């Protein structure tokens, strides 16, 4: 599991973050996304979400997959470093569509758009080299959250405007001074490079991609189905900061191991992958619970074709948490409310902090 990969444990909470899509008052200007010319003989874009089998952030990968597939405006593939199951962090497992090497053989001209989620190993040389190669073939690169580390190491941000998760921002600014780092925008567009803040910024950024490819009416239709009013880049990062009280809550939850529990999320064929990802991500960030999918089937397919691999086992005492029938983007609000009721408002606060999600509606 993801928590075991990071030492000391407090680094875990900042490895990946997200940004909320709630209404805010902070104004931010943004250029529209302009899709590069399609590769020869294509009638619509070929979009790739690259994944490291050893650890790729859950919402960073699943949300763009669900939004783009549901829009029906592009061909989309999840491309992994090697064959086999992709472990998502902090929860879920999926099967990719193909591998980087197989993709290169089948599509030597490259992808039109490459989406880069945050990954456990943000120094993975194979992933970085592959991103660099795709960028050299005129692919648009879209980094989600701390996928920015991989994109930056591939040289994608050199001389360009970019952003990332609030906690990583200052370190990335020091590490990659050739980029122009931008605060207080959920996503930043600079030519054929797009970057976002935290994990949930994948929703507005994905909708902006849908608008660029399929038009505003299509994006509005998809947004309505998600329960989202818009996809503005406006964002106020000021509330997202570490405080002594929050540090104590992380430590207290982590150290109270006798109170840790497993949360089982029932899933059936045709499930909504966005709703599942948001629920699993939230429940697995409390430092008191871990979300698992435990079903008899060897694999389960979402309504948009994502193949989920259930976790092989769970404790007999695992609590079952039904995902409510709400618009997918509202599932996070529901999860935070349930977390507050179960563990207290301070725990729901640190979950929202990790997700860089604004609870001010």
Task: Please name every model-derived segment.
Residues 154-155, 191-212:
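Short alpha-helices
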Residues 182-194, 227:
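Conserved Rossmann-fold dehydrogenase catalytic segment
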Residues 1-6:
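N-terminal secretory signal peptides that target proteins for export/translocation
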Residues 158-184:
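A conserved active-site-flanking secondary-structure segment within enzyme catalytic domains
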Residues 53, 161, 191, 195-198, ...:
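Glycine- and other small-residue-rich loops at beta-strand/loop junctions that grip anionic moieties
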Residues 9-21:
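Bacterial N-terminal signal peptides
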Residues 26-141, 149-153, 183, 207-361:
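Extended, subdomain-level signal for the structured scaffold at the beginning of enzyme domains
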